[in-house]
């Protein structure tokens, strides 16, 4: 079976994670895909297949005889999809020989256009997979799952010599907790790769340092007709806080290694208001400087409006795994070589986000990220090509060969 055929089977299984849930997994529906994958892993000849009660799925492919002493290499992808855009009733559409221009998705008003996604012109002539424009596609990260499964199948069918291989599929990556309950010892790999990137050939090992920053503003509400010098409008204070941040240090104004403050949500009345940010930077010192800026704003606002008006809570999320990967750069060197062997241009890029591999690297499993061939995740424009998926399978297959040498 080809990777895209598996993807088409997987995306119709609904698996949104829920950031407001206190359970693990955050949504019971993730077990629906996990059980399907559990059965498929067993059919493919994986051993020690275990689906635990927190929806982590593990399996192993024992080494070819004589290669048992080679490093155990793991491959990881996540089962959940985002819940911040419609994920109900996903209807994938396959467009053969895409012309590289504007494409209406199904009967929706959603137009996939090179004006917004210039790389589309490079996909001319390929077979393009999209949703019908009303939902996400779910290639993030079911494409990664499909490619890992297809690689395992190919190794078995073609009897490709290999060292010990480990496979895991995780829940809740999209809400930042995918690695929280990952059992590294159970997994059994010395090194790992997540397949959770974009363009085929992507190699990523420098991710953001990340935290959440939550402001709660307490106002003082009196009748507006008699409030001179007494009213404190919490919503206006919230506006002051946001205006105190560097105006260009937002996702829209930054790229590559540049960090940002991102206002995720806000709410407010006169009496109380809230601002919820995520803060990101690749550079550790610049990241710390951003947190100091937030604390200084809190201090300034309380000096202006009265102590206790503004309360800031900063919650750490994840760190840049580059410091861990720097100790085992063979992971990157071999990934580059695997791309070249698969006739794919290696693209070493910073991750403007995070993956399960970020946290796993700090739990003792160095784990850079590889591309799957997908684009424009987390919305109705999400798309991937059959050819990109095939090449991603080629890359991980070549990786397996390199670690068996």
Predicted regions and their residues:
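N-terminal capping segment at the start of a domain
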Residues: 2-28, 130, 318, 378-379
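A non-catalytic alpha/beta surface segment that caps or lines the substrate-entry region
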Residues: 22-70, 74-76, 80, 91
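Active-site metal-coordination/substrate-binding segment of hydrolases
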Residues: 67-161, 189
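Short, conserved charged micro-motifs
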Residues: 68-69, 223, 284-289
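Acidic/histidine-rich catalytic neighborhood of metal-dependent amide-processing enzymes
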Residues: 121-208, 248-268, 272-282, 288, ...
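Glycine/charged-rich beta-loop-alpha catalytic/anionic-binding loops adjacent to active sites
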Residues: 121-135, 218-222, 342, 374-378
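Phosphate/diphosphate-binding glycine-rich loops and adjacent basic-rich segments that engage nucleotide
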Residues: 194-227, 231-237
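Metal-dependent amide/peptide-bond hydrolase catalytic core
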Residues: 235-405
């Amino acid at each position: 079976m080809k990777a895209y055929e598996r993807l088409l089977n997987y995306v119709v299984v609904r698996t949104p994670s829920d950031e407001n849930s206190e359970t693990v997994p955050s949504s019971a529906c993730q077990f629906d895909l996990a059980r399907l994958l559990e059965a498929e892993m067993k059919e493919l000849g994986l051993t020690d297949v275990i689906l635990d009660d927190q929806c982590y799925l593990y399996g192993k492919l024992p080494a070819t005889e004589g290669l048992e002493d080679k490093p155990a290499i793991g491959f990881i992808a996540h089962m959940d999809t985002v819940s911040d855009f419609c994920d109900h009733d996903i209807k994938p559409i396959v467009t053969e020989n895409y012309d590289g221009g504007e494409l209406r998705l199904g009967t929706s008003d959603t137009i996939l256009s090179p004006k917004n996604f210039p790389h589309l012109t490079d996909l001319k002539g390929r077979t393009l997979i999209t949703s019908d424009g009303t939902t996400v596609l779910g290639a993030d990260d079911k494409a990664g799952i499909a490619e890992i499964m297809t690689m395992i199948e190919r190794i078995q069918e073609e009897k490709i010599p290999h060292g010990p291989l480990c496979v895991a599929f995780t829940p809740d990556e999209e809400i930042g907790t995918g690695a929280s309950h990952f059992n590294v010892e159970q997994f059994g790999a010395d090194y790992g790769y997540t397949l959770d990137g974009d363009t085929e050939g992507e190699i990523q090992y420098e991710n953001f340092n990340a935290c959440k920053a939550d402001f709660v503003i307490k106002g003082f509400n009196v009748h507006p007709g008699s409030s001179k010098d007494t009213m404190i409008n919490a919503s206006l204070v919230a506006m002051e806080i946001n205006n105190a941040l560097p105006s260009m240090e937002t996702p829209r104004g930054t790229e590559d290694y540049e960090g940002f403050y991102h206002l995720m949500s806000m709410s407010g009345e006169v009496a109380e208001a809230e601002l919820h940010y995520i803060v990101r930077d690749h550079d550790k010192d610049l990241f710390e400087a951003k947190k100091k800026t937030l604390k200084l704003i809190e201090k300034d606002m309380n000096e202006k409006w009265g102590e206790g008006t503004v309360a800031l809570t900063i919650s750490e999320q994840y760190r840049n795994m580059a410091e861990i990967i720097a100790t085992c750069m063979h992971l990157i060197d071999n990934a580059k070589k695997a791309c070249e062997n698969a006739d794919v241009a290696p693209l070493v890029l910073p991750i403007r986000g995070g993956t399960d591999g970020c946290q796993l690297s700090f739990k003792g499993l160095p784990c850079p990220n590889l591309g799957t061939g997908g684009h424009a995740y987390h919305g109705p424009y999400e798309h991937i090509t059959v050819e990109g998926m095939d090449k991603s399978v080629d890359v991980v297959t070549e990786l397996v060969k390199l670690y068996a040498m």
